[in-house]
């Protein structure tokens, strides 16, 4: 099997389509216009998917999958992931080597395999037409006899034996993969030959049209450094050359070109190769000609070839742009530095930037959020989890303006729930973190609640679907932990357990004693879990005193610790920041706070087993939940705060009064025979959209004021949302609360007020004489229907026209007033932003000098210090550097508050990047590299929130990343050695 077309089960994952199922198909490499692409074909048919590979490969991984089979996994720059399984190991290895060569930009246009280069030729065919090649070959035959007389036939025989082998099209005797067999013969002369390309443009065009057999024969002879041509018969020296010989050959070629004796000098330089061509072998190497691989000497066909065709000019231009292997490349560090860009400060939003950078650095958290196939189009546009994920995906690949816009959307999503974050005043980073995590959990709960009840067509018999349909909440699997509080009666020993879930722990600063060294985060954590006495009435014995112990019942992957760096001054009624020095250890241990029943953190594979990876079908990518005729319509649980806003405008109070008046007048014209019966029907059918006839024939005159108001609201709500016929039941409705755009910046749907698709009951029996149908829309943009068959038709129309004119006048006045209020509000907001920014800068500058605090600080006055034995203290000290104790956690991020007061200052974040295996400081938009020791020493007085990852989870992630990088490095070395 050709290594450039491999077959097996294929799975694709991307942000647009989610994760697809395994389907039989093939990967095929196609080269076109100096670009290499991967074409995915499925055996079931359909349109092939094409992925560009040139400058787009992020990682290539090959893993064993059964006996003599492998799985090839390809990651692109946009985090798209392609896998093909059950591929023969040999073919998979050759494909991997080729992809790595493309990844490392070591497969330029001038060196791509052609039809004669082994097994790659069937796919990356030649660019020269067969007709042109045949013309070249026939020309070579005609010229061979004329040149034999002047050539040295002594060296011709062994060379012809090597190149005349019919099997030379794929030189299978050379060790290595398909790439190693093809590229070495081209790279040996690429460097000196490039210098001759800029000398004579006409000559280069003509040299391009020479045959592939001429080119292949020129390479060994040009590198010949002996008179008896030993290099032609020695395989180990066949593709090696002396740099000095190349330079001499190049110099001689330039002298020949300037002397004008091109045909004669060319023939004497290359010996008798032209006369010894065997076209039976040369015919299998079509279009091996390329500008970057041409020799600098003039070709023998100078006076006989026709004028260059446009195809040759096009080829020349493409290859001339490529400068070859020795082109100075931009160092990898510069690319990383370009990607390392922080978040813009929108106006005192440093607290948000610091928290987001710390959360985004949690690799397991990001994987659980992005890689389980969450149907983003099912989630409302303004939901935090959607805004959060969009920013996480785009933060390293979009420009600063787009990133700033995404940041605003994240802030607005949180401000919609917590108004204290809506302005531009300073806020506490821990409060923002708590709000963010709680809101993400709520969004996931709402998604799972809707997802469980939604039917999925065509998946009833699928073995991949388990009984529980649920997506994994990244907050629960990574950050949430459970603590069991045991209340023990000191009189009778009765134990009352109570469990509580936390996303983080707020720990106190221990009171510092002068002779002792500074306390550490470990001390504060142990202080939190110490046993304490409290007054408690025992139900069993009536005792009044109890002891409370706290133990971990379930551990998190990442433990977040919030250090209370503030104290309340009762006299001044102010919160003061505590600048006490606190040692930040590399490792923490929770072993003394765990029991034998304590559950370990969720493993990294837990999410994949528990979450249902449901591929997004075309029907699931619309902008709303689909309403099925066989099942009731389900409302998405993300609802608006005010249900009245669904059908009424903000200034619709007068309209409501008029609707009530019209309804009362209508009741006087209606009969009273079926009023009670219709009222009962209306109360029974309240979950379903009632008929117009039922609502309008209801006994309005017998209703109370509240009941009448509710009935009129029901009519207005029904008329405000357009109903669909039975023919449109299968068509989804568009809504901003249920749509997911591909880039979150799209046009709003047509019906923004429609929350769900409602089907009106079919009206089977209507008596035009018994009632009059009145329809009034809330937006007042539609024409009102006039009643038919009523006695007061003329009076009603006149009164309605007068009311309509009055309403229009009131609407204009309200609109003008609203615009004035909006302008005033915007002006006030701008003033608040400027004032807050100036105040923040002033307070920050005034407090920066005192940011380090004082050694006189003694921590919180009501908190005692922990007492350890000498052995315990020594053990904790060793564990702080090694993490050898059970249940140890490793420091991965610190959020620091710079400033002397708790009401003002600036937040920064230090995070450990597992992929780069280095620490970085994020100061809003600025990013800088920092050493871990500097983080521990520089943040000992300003560290506010600390992120610690479970050591086993950290080691597993780090090992996976190292293996991935070492695999790429090995592949690069192997490829370079082969070249």
UniProtKB/Swiss-Prot annotation:
A motif (KEN box 3) lies at residues 782-784. Residues 243-257, 681-695, 719-732, 774-786 have a biased composition (Basic and acidic residues). Gene3D superfamilies: Cysteine proteinases, Ubiquitin carboxyl-terminal hydrolase 26/29/37, pleckstrin homology-like domain. The active site is at residues 350, 906. This is Ubiquitin carboxyl-terminal hydrolase 37. Expressed in brain and prostate. A motif (D-box 3) lies at residues 160-168. Residues 183-198 have a biased composition (Low complexity). Deubiquitinase that plays a role in different processes including cell cycle regulation, DNA replication or DNA damage response. Antagonizes the anaphase-promoting complex (APC/C) during G1/S transition by mediating deubiquitination of cyclin-A (CCNA1 and CCNA2), thereby promoting S phase entry. Specifically mediates deubiquitination of 'Lys-11'-linked polyubiquitin chains, a specific ubiquitin-linkage type mediated by the APC/C complex. Phosphorylation at Ser-628 during G1/S phase maximizes the deubiquitinase activity, leading to prevent degradation of cyclin-A (CCNA1 and CCNA2). Residues 110-153, 183-304, 673-701, 719-795 are annotated as: Disordered. Keywords: Cell cycle, Cell division, Chromosome, Hydrolase, Mitosis, Nucleus, Phosphoprotein, Protease, Repeat, Thiol protease, Ubl conjugation, Ubl conjugation pathway. The modification Phosphoserine is found at residues 114, 170, 210, 628, 650, 652, 770. GO terms for cellular component: chromosome; cytosol; nucleoplasm; nucleus. GO terms for molecular function: cysteine-type deubiquitinase activity; cysteine-type endopeptidase activity; protein kinase binding.
């Amino acid at each position: 099997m050709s290594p450039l077309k491999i077959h097996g089960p294929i799975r694709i994952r991307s942000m647009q389509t989610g994760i697809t199922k395994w389907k039989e198909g093939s990967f095929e490499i196609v080269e076109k216009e100096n670009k290499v692409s991967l074409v995915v074909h499925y055996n079931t048919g359909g349109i092939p998917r094409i992925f560009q590979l040139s400058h787009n490969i992020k990682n290539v991984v090959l893993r064993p999958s059964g006996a003599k089979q492998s799985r090839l996994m390809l990651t692109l720059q946009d985090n798209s992931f392609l896998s093909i399984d059950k591929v023969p190991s040999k073919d998979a290895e050759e494909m991997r080597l080729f992809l790595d060569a493309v990844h490392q930009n070591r497969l330029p246009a001038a060196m791509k395999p052609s039809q004669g280069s082994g097994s790659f030729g069937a796919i990356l065919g030649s660019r020269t037409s067969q007709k042109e090649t045949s013309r070249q070959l026939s020309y070579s035959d005609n010229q061979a006899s004329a040149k034999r007389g002047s050539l040295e036939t002594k060296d011709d025989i062994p060379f012809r034996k090597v190149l005349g082998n019919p099997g030379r099209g794929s030189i299978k005797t050379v060790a290595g993969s398909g790439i190693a067999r093809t590229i070495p013969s081209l790279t040996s002369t690429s460097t000196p030959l490039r210098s001759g390309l800029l000398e004579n443009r006409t000559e280069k065009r003509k040299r391009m049209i020479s045959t592939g057999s001429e080119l292949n024969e020129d390479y060994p002879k040009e590198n010949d450094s002996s008179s008896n041509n030993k290099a032609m018969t020695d395989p180990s020296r066949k593709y090696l050359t002396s740099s000095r010989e190349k330079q001499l050959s190049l110099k001689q070629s330039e002298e020949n070109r300037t002397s004008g004796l091109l045909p004669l000098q060319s023939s004497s330089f290359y010996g008798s190769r032209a006369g010894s061509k065997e076209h039976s072998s040369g015919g299998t190497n079509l279009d091996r000609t390329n500008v970057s691989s041409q020799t600098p000497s003039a070709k023998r066909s100078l006076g006989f070839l026709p004028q260059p065709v446009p195809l040759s000019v096009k080829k020349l231009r493409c290859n001339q742009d490529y400068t070859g292997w020795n082109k100075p490349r931009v160092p990898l560090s510069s690319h990383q530095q370009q990607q390392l860009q922080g978040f813009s400060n929108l106006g005192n939003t440093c607290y948000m930037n610091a928290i987001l950078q710390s959360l985004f650095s949690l690799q397991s958290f990001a994987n659980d959020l992005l890689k389980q196939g969450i149907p983003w189009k099912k989630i409302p546009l303004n939901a935090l989890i959607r805004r959060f994920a969009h920013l996480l995906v785009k933060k390293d690949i979009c420009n600063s303006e787009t990133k700033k816009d995404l940041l605003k959307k994240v802030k607005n999503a949180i401000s919609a729930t917590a108004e204290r974050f809506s302005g531009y005043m300073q806020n506490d980073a821990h409060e923002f973190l708590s709000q963010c995590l709680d809101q993400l959990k709520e969004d996931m709960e709402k998604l799972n609640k809707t997802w469980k009840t939604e039917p999925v067509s065509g998946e009833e018999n699928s073995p991949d679907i388990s009984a529980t349909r649920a997506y994994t909440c990244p907050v629960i699997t990574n950050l949430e932990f459970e603590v069991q509080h045991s209340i023990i009666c000191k009189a009778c020993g009765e134990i009352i357990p109570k469990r509580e879930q936390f996303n983080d722990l707020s720990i106190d600063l221990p009171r510092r004693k002068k002779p002792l060294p500074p306390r550490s985060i470990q001390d504060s954590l142990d202080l939190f879990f110490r046993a304490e006495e409290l007054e408690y009435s025992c139900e069993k014995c009536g005792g009044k005193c109890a002891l409370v112990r706290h133990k971990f019942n379930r551990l998190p992957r990442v433990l977040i610790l919030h250090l209370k760096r503030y104290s309340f001054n009762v006299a001044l009624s102010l919160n003061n920041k505590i600048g006490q020095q606190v040692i930040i250890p590399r490792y923490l241990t929770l072993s003394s706070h765990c029991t034998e029943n304590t559950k370990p953190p969720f493993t990294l594979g837990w999410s994949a087993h528990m979450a249902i990876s449901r591929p997004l079908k075309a029907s699931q990518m619309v902008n709303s939940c689909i309403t099925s005729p066989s099942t009731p319509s389900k409302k998405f649980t993300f609802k608006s705060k005010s249900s009245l806003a669904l059908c009424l405008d903000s200034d619709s109070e007068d309209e409501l009064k008029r609707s009530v008046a019209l309804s009362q007048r209508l009741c006087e014209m209606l009969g009273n025979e079926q009023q009670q019966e219709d009222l009962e029907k209306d109360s029974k059918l309240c979950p379903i959209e009632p008929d117009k006839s039922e609502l309008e024939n209801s006994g309005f005159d017998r209703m109370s004021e509240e009941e009448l108001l509710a009935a009129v609201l029901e009519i207005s709500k029904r008329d405000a949302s357009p109903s669909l016929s039975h023919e449109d039941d299968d068509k989804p409705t568009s809504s901003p609360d249920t749509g997911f755009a591909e880039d979150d910046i799209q046009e709003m749907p047509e019906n923004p007020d429609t929350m769900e698709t409602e089907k009106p009951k079919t009206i089977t029996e209507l008596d035009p004489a018994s009632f009059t149908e009145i329809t009034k829309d809330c937006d007042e943009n539609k024409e009102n229907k006039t009643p038919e068959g009523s006695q007061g038709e003329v009076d009603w129309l006149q009164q309605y026209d007068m009311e309509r004119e009055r309403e229009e006048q009131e609407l204009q006045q309200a609109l003008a007033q609203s615009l004035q209020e909006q302008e005033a509000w915007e002006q006030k907001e701008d003033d608040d932003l400027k004032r807050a920014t100036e105040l923040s800068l002033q307070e920050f500058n005034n407090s920066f000098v005192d940011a380090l605090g004082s050694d006189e600080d003694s921590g919180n006055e009501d908190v005692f210090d922990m007492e350890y034995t000498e052995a315990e203290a020594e053990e904790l000290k060793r564990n702080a550097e090694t993490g050898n104790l059970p249940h140890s956690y490793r420091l991965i991020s610190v959020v620091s508050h710079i400033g002397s007061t708790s009401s003002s200052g600036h937040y920064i974040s230090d995070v450990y990047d597992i992929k780069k295996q280095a620490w970085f400081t994020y100061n809003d938009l600025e990013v800088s590299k920092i050493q871990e020791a500097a983080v521990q020493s520089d943040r000992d007085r300003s560290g506010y929130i600390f992120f610690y990852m479970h050591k086993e989870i950290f080691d597993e992630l780090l090992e996976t990343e190292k293996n991935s990088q070492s695999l790429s490095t090995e592949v690069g070395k192997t490829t370079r050695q082969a070249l």
